[in-house]
Amino acid sequence: MKKEHLYSGKGKSIFATDNPNHIIMHFRDDLTAFNGEKKETCLGKGIYLNNINAFLMDKLAQQGVKTSFIEKINQRESLTHKLDMIQLEFVVRNIAAGTIVKRVGLTKGSPLSPPIQELFLKNDKLGDPFINIHYVNSLKITSAEVVAQAEKISLQVNDIIKDVFTKINIDLVDFKLEFGLLDGELYLGDEISPDTCRLWDQKSKRPFDKDLFRFDLGDVKEGYDRICELLGLKVTIDTHDLQADHQDN
């Protein structure tokens, strides 16, 4: 049962449940970019992301990846395990795009083989800075063993999700993951969605992700709806769902 509101991030609100080991992730319709500097509301966006995330988390679980996801409980919300989150973001890049293009001087769209893995400190006030294992060790964020395990799982996740999208003629350009501990074991947490991945049409290279909003490249709702359609997800957005998003936050 959904209880008190615990906290809100950029696009989700977290609620307690009757079980102290479980939480509810409520996907809101807020769109943010550039560390919250650009903001907008896209009605129904949270519903698309909740459905896509549930689908991908199920795929990962089927392949033996331990995730926080338990079940989708309605159009906007999912029940998950409560993790002790690690304050790092693990990024996997299959194709050059975003910050790596400027930072390393790569050409946008260049394939990266093997994939490049990057670490970022999860800190909104600092803009989630790019770091390496030496920072992790010195600042005692977590152990080097946990980082190595998370990076290994990240590549496994990459193989599974890339295959899912390749089958629908979409390139998985890059994505970020977050991890947490549960009873001493490492679990994949947070979400996997067009808000946390770059997804390009294989032929046209048209994006179907949050870059549509970041760089004013098109309609976000259309892009997310297209991903749902390609994945075979039947997503219905009605007035009650939209009202619920505002009532719960």
Where are these regions (language model features)?
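Active-site loop/lid in soluble adenylation, ligation, and acyl-transfer enzymes
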Residues: 1-120, 231, 241, 246
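Residues forming anionic-ligand binding surfaces in small-molecule and nucleic-acid pockets
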Residues: 27-36, 116-144
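Short beta-strand elements
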Residues: 27-28, 94, 187-194
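A short glycine-rich, hydrophobically flanked beta-strand micro-motif that places a catalytic Asp/Glu
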Residues: 71-75, 166-180
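Conserved metal-phosphate-binding beta-hairpin within the catalytic cores
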Residues: 92, 172-190
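C-terminal helix-cap and adjacent tail motif
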Residues: 110, 192-249
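Phosphate-binding core of ATP-grasp and ATP-grasp-like enzymes
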Residues: 110-127, 158-171, 193-198
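A long amphipathic alpha-helix within ATP-dependent nucleotide-binding catalytic cores
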Residues: 141-173
